[in-house]
Amino acid sequence: MKTFAHSKEPVALVTGGSAGLGRALVTALAEAGWDVITDARRESRLRDLPPGVTAIAGDITDADHRAAIAVYVAQRGRLDLLVHNASTLGPTPLPRLDEVSVDDLQSVWRPNIGAPLVLTAELLPQLVASGGVLLSISSDAAVEHYPGWGLYGASKAALDHITLQYGAENPGIRAYAVDPGDMRTDMHQAAFPGEDISDRPLPETVVPAILQLIDSGLPSGRYRAAALPVRELVR
């Protein structure tokens, strides 16, 4: 394993960075000069990330994988941003709640709630020391009610609560749950099999609002990306 001197650049860990919003966010952070660590289950999808991004293949629900991530963070000597992006939609077609089994529940809640809860706990000392940002990618399904979205939506509602609870218990950090809105991603397509989702915006269009929130100093809370003002860049 490569040994790193303590990083002089801000350090970000973004889970699930191989595709969709995670990949777009990893790319933008790296281009902005952040020292970025990310992970994904499929190693093949991590090979063409931007130069300088540290990519770790593995399942975020696996304790050994999380321990490996923690080693990479410790080598940097700091953690300024922790983004919980990795998640699963669950069984498709999306089931009604009365069709959800205990196995379905566990398969969704372990990556969507359990892993973020314990990974945050494992990395909390570094995040608190830096006065960093804890940011979880939420969904409007966490607060609205759509047929078939109950299992996934409940997991995101729980993730919102966990995220903001960490903020309440650790006032030295800022904690954000962010609803990015509908996006043109593989996960969104899986939720609407056979439908044309080409009218949905690309994940890259959401990233500026998220980056501005990270930099804003706004109080901990739940935010919609579409409602966040984005400053025009002056070139």
Describe the residue ranges of each PLM region:
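Active-site loop of short-chain dehydrogenase/reductase
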Residues: E9-P10, R78-D80, L127-S138, P171-R174, ...
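Conserved glycine-rich cofactor-binding loop
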Residues: S18-A19
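Conserved glycine-rich Rossmann-like NAD(P)H-binding loop of the short-chain dehydrogenase/reductase
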Residues: A32-D48
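Rossmann-fold cofactor-recognition segment
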Residues: P50-D64
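Catalytic loop of short-chain dehydrogenase/reductase
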Residues: T88-L89, R96-V102, G131-A158, T163-P171, ...
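A short, exposed helix-loop element centered on a Lys and neighboring polar residues
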Residues: T120-A121, L164
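C-terminal helical subdomain
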Residues: I173, A177-P180, T185, P193-R235
